[in-house]
Regions:
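Rhodanese-like catalytic fold shared by cysteine-dependent sulfurtransferases
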Residues: 1-26, 33-82, 93-141
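Short, surface-exposed ligand- or partner-binding patches at beta-edge/loop junctions that are enriched
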Residues: 86
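Conserved G/P- and acidic residue-centered "switch" motifs that form tight phosphate/ATP-binding loops
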Residues: 90
Length: 141
């Protein structure tokens, strides 16, 4: 294991490999609905899977979603499933992975680069790392 309170951080290549080769792996996008609508979302259709969407925090106040555990439970996923959490940059997804691990989910990973990745030298996201920059499938609108 590791010294983390969840299964660990994974990069785009490892996440895609898990989603592709582990039939009981799931991607949970825990960004806000505004981000899903305006920035785009991971597209797993060529794997025969769907991304699950459950907000960790709600826009615009960014308050923690008190129904997060309930909404995850309603997805019907086993606590033994491999769950990969993704947010914009890896912070909220880490919190979500830790939270669910503490609630009995055994294989919660943080997509540590996030959907948009780190800031570049100009303070913009999307050009350094992350889901989009790694050329993994995504869609907008």
């Amino acid at each position: 294991m590791n010294d983390l309170d969840y299964a660990g951080d994974i990069n785009p290549e490892k996440a895609w490999d898990l989603l592709k080769n582990n039939k009981d792996s799931h991607l949970i996008d825990c960004r806000t609905s505004a981000e899903w609508n305006f920035v785009g979302v991971p597209d797993l259709t060529n794997l025969g899977k769907n991304t699950h969407f459950v907000e960790w925090q709600s826009y615009p106040l960014m308050e923690k979603n008190d129904n997060f555990l309930k909404e995850i439970s309603e997805l019907g996923l086993s606590k033994d499933s491999t769950l990969i959490f993704i947010c914009r940059s890896g912070a909220r997804s880490r919190s979500a992975a830790e939270f669910l691990t503490n609630h009995g989910y055994k294989h919660c990973f943080n997509f540590c680069e996030g959907f948009e990745g780190s800031h570049d030298e100009l303070g913009h996201r999307g050009s350094v790392n992350g889901w989009k920059n790694s050329k993994l499938p995504w869609k907008q609108g």
